[in-house]
């Protein structure tokens, strides 16, 4: 790839981060839970006077990056350290997205479900763009890949186990922090887990070819 194409792909990846973060913001605003990978940060952000969701996402992503370094050791590629500034950018985009959608009323349950569905669609679009960019993995996917490669396991199976582990950890944190009450992890989390992958596949079919043509020009 030429330097120009590489630059275009990184710009595309940053754009994908914005849409992914906006999708998270929509689901968060719906108050029915967020995607599994964001569920731990979401629970931690529910504490009064604590950090915002964006800040907790930065911290969570940095923990996952550290996990990659520990698992891969000498096999960890230095280029993957770019995940750190990109994690900060994702956290900022998430808080900005929450500000953007903050005016939308969510009093009714139907409206909350709508927010979750819209969030999943936007998140799916963002993830599909990041796949098309093909420059660097987000910290969650990279962490799963590190485990799968090291343990010689199927990526999809490890991803499912990782998502389930995130939800279980979020539930445990919620019970411990909020007097045995489940906070921040609800049916929206399950819906996101089941439907985000489908949205990504749909957008991949629609956008992969034109996006690749665009960045290759």
Q: Language-model segments: what does each one mean?
A:
Residues 1-217:
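Core subunits and conserved enzymes of cellular information-processing
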């Amino acid at each position: 790839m030429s330097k120009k194409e590489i630059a275009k792909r990184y710009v595309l990846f940053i754009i994908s981060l914005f849409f992914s973060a906006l999708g998270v913001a929509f689901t968060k605003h719906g108050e029915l839970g967020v995607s599994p990978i964001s569920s731990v940060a979401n629970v931690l952000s529910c504490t009064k006077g604590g950090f915002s969701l964006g800040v907790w996402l930065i911290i969570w992503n940095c923990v996952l990056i550290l996990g990659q370094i520990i698992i891969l050791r000498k096999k960890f590629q230095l280029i993957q350290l770019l995940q750190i500034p990109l994690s900060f950018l994702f956290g900022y985009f998430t808080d900005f997205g929450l500000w953007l959608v903050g005016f939308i009323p969510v009093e009714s349950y139907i409206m909350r479900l709508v927010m979750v569905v819209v969030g999943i669609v936007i998140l799916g679009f963002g993830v599909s763009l990041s796949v098309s960019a093909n420059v660097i993995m987000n910290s969650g996917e990279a962490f799963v890949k590190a485990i799968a490669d090291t343990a010689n396991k199927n990526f999809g199976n490890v991803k499912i186990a990782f998502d389930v582990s995130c939800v279980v950890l979020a539930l445990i944190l919620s019970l411990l922090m909020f007097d045995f009450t489940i906070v921040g992890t609800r049916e929206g989390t399950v819906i996101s887990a089941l439907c985000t992958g489908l949205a990504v596949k749909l957008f991949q079919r629609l956008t992969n070819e034109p996006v690749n043509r665009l960045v290759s020009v």
